[in-house]
Structure formats: structure tokens, C-alpha cells
Amino acid sequence: MKEAIINAVIQKLETELGRQSQANVQSNATTAYSASNADKQRDTTGFEAAFLAHGYAVHCMDLSHRLDELRSMPIEDFTGQEIDIGALVEVEMGGDVDWYLLLHCGGGTEVEVDRTKVTVITPESPLGAALMGNIEAGFVELPSGAEGIILSVC
């Protein structure tokens, strides 16, 4: 099941990369047009578009690099081990049971595989940081004070 989840995450991130790449192309086109067709001496539309295009380009490069890492990441079984990148974790918090996949990228991405909704979290998130190094049946406490129990790790 974990392989199917990771593949679904990769597919969603590839779609996002395509959107970001298209936005980068559009920003570059706006930059070229605005710079050569400025209305006034202080027209900064071209500069703003260039700044935006640069941001999209950096984001695309980072996402592309992270996708390459994700595609080559070995799928490990974390049963009985400390939680680390690549772990699929079931957590009960406040009466709700949720599944999380801990990855370096794609935080907040949600996928559904075999009628199970899984949310990607990163070690930089409060929940990701609380889970890192923890074990099955361990307790997690978030900075907000919310507490939960780790039901399973795979």
C-alpha cells in the first residue's frame, strides 16, 4: 500500500510542477513584454514580473530536485523502528484517526488509496517534528498542546 501512496504523491507533485512551470513561462513572457512596453519612466511591471518569474523558476528547480529524490527513495518498512522519512504513520488525536506519510517534500498533499486518506507531512511541520524518532504506541504532543498516540508505523 505504501508504494501506491508514494506513487500517488509523486503524481500530484508532478502535476504541481507542471502548473509551476507554466506559471514560470507566463511570467517570463510578461517580463519581456512589460520591459519593452513600459508606459512611464517609473513603470515597474517588468521588474515585478521578473521577480515573480525568478521565484517560480527557483520553486520549479527545488520541486524537480525533490521529485527526483522521492522517485529514487527506497520503500522501507518502519515496523518496530523509529519513525523517519518514508514512514507511514497512523495517529489517533482527539478521537480522530488519521494516516500521515513523512517525506522531505509535498507537505500538505493529500492522496486517497484504497479508501484511505493519507496526508504528507514534513519534519519541519509541528506534527512531523513530534513524530520523528518516535515509535509505535508512543505519544505525541504538539506545541499547541494537542496530544495523540501512534497506533501503527509501517
What is the role of each PLM region?
Residues M1-R66:
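Helix-rich terminal scaffold detector
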Residues G80-P143:
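Non-DNA-binding regulatory cores of transcription-related proteins
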